Amino acid sequence: VVEAYVNGVSTRDMSLLAESLGVSSLSASEVSRLASELDAQVGELRSRGLDDQRYCYLWVDATYVRCRVGGRSVSQAVVTAIALGEDGRKRLVGLDCVDTESYADWRAFLATVRARGLSGLVLCVSDDHAGLVRALAEVFQGCAWQRCTVHLQRNLSAKVRSAKNERLV
């Protein structure tokens, strides 16, 4: 239900979709209620304070997905930040939708996470996107940066003919 809603299926069409999946009744108001609950949970996550402990490591990434914006389904970058706390647990500490992965969008996203209390970072891990690396260096000054090995492997694999990929990677 949530995925269909995010992808732009109208609340009225959701009842038809639900019926085709074997759900006997799903009204437009129920879909709206579910969407509101989801919005509230995301809002809580995005505003939750992070000053309860120090966080050592931060992983930052983006993926493009279809999002519902102004009643339309459009492609946007969902940017995420996952941090490892001193208690040894990973937490999703940042989540947002942006139009592009520009330096300005990354800087605004990271500044929001920092303003909520993220501190103590030793290492940030991300892909080699120039705007992201610059934003990380500015927002988390003094924190070391490492290129994500998964992204590096994917980038290398894309540049090597596929017959040779298995031997090299």
What is the predicted function of each stretch?
Residues 163-169:
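A polyampholytic, Gly/Pro-enriched intrinsically disordered region
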Residues 20, 24-126, 130, 134-142:
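RNase H-like nuclease fold core
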Residues 141-158:
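Inter-helix linker motif
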Residues 1-8:
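Short, amphipathic alpha-helical "recognition" segments used to contact nucleic acids or chromatin
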Residues 8-18:
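Short, charged amphipathic recognition helices of the HTH superfamily
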Residues 2, 103-106, 165:
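Short, charged, low-complexity patches
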